Amino acid sequence: MLPVYAYLLHLLSGCVLIAVFFAIYTWITPFDEIALIREGNMAAALSLAGAVVGFCLTLASSILHSDGYEMFLLWSVGAMVVQSGGYAAITRMLPQMNGAIEHNNAAMGALMGTASLALGIINAACLS
């Protein structure tokens, strides 16, 4: 495959995978992040941003270190599972997290976003 085609394949696939992750992540949370963000809810924005960036770090590492396109897709699905599992674990450890985000507790949103970002960094490093 010509390098430009490989580039376009990974770029377009990455964009689609980000959209899929975004849809899944916002579906599993019990509140509507987009509506909250439109209302100016900083906690929801921080939480969602951390999850998306954490996922993107794993996508980038997968593109860099995978032997082929199929492995890139496999690791991407794995990253979705890890990020979603991280959300589930944090909200189980901190049951007030969801309510705090809905009520625009920016500190809790930052904590959730930072935890998601940290998980994404570790997950990305595991692929190298």
Which residues does each predicted region cover?
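Short alpha-helical packing/oligomerization segments
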Residues: 2, 60-87
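Hydrophobic alpha-helical transmembrane segments
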Residues: 8-12, 72-77, 110-111
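N-terminal signal-anchor/start-transfer transmembrane helix
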Residues: 10-30
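Alpha-helical transmembrane segments and their lipid-water interface positions
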Residues: 17, 21-22, 86-91, 128
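Loop-to-helix transition at the N-terminal end of transmembrane alpha-helices
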Residues: 36-49
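Hydrophobic alpha-helical transmembrane segments in multi-pass integral membrane proteins
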Residues: 51-63, 113-128
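Transmembrane alpha-helical segments of integral membrane proteins
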Residues: 83-99
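Interfacial loop-to-transmembrane junctions
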Residues: 96-116
